[in-house]
Regions:
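Conserved N-terminal beta-strand and adjoining loop/helix that marks the start
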Residues: 1-21, 39, 91
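A generic structural micro-feature
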Residues: 2-6, 32, 80-86, 111-116
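Conserved Nudix-box catalytic region and its N-terminal flanking loop in Nudix hydrolases
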Residues: 16-56
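Short loop segments at secondary-structure junctions
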Residues: 16-19, 26, 93-98, 124-126
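Nudix hydrolase/Nudix homology domain
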Residues: 30-33, 99-101, 105-147
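Internal catalytic or translocation cores that form aromatic/hydrophobic pockets or channels
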Residues: 51, 70-73, 85
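A short coil-to-beta-strand element that immediately follows conserved catalytic motifs
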Residues: 61-70
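Active-site-adjacent beta-strand/loop module that shapes the phosphate/pyrophosphate-binding cleft
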Residues: 75-104
Length: 147
């Protein structure tokens, strides 16, 4: 048995004009739909980590509005069964008008020979738990439906 560890993730729930932002990603040969964000780096706080993720992925800065949800059940990592995922979600908004490319359909990825991703806006009234890949994102989608 390998070393068991925690994997802390931070994600932004970005709502704009009645839609929520998701990313369609091709990672390690798998199609994944999730909320924007990613892993915390050592020495980073959750808010700074989320801001960094948005600059890296979208090329834009976000404002953190408030905490939305933190994982409250056990979830092993999809990529490392010896790792427990703890995800923290914040409601965010862009500091300027979104200027990154957005796709209309799921998995309109330019290159499937390497890890890649694309942003997509989903109407909040249409978001379903099954639209997202990971169990924690599914929980957040369910919470969004009750807003």
């Amino acid at each position: 048995m390998g070393e068991r560890k925690f994997n802390v993730r931070v994600y932004g729930v970005c709502l704009l004009n009645g839609k929520v932002l998701v990313t369609d990603e091709f990672i390690k040969g798998k199609e994944i739909t999730k909320f924007p964000g990613g892993g915390l780096e050592f020495g980073e706080g959750t808010i700074d980590g989320l801001k960094r993720e948005f600059v890296e992925e979208a090329g834009q800065e976000v404002k953190i509005l408030r905490h939305f949800y933190t994982t409250d059940f056990f979830v092993p990592s999809a990529f490392d069964p010896e790792s427990q995922v703890i995800s923290i979600y914040y409601l965010v908004e862009f500091l300027s008008e979104p200027a990154f490319p957005v796709k209309e359909k799921c998995f309109e990825l330019a290159d499937r020979t390497k890890d890649s991703f694309a942003f997509r806006w989903v109407p909040l009234s249409e978001i379903e738990e099954d639209d997202l890949t990971f169990p924690i994102d599914k929980r957040v989608a369910g919470l969004l439906r009750t807003m």
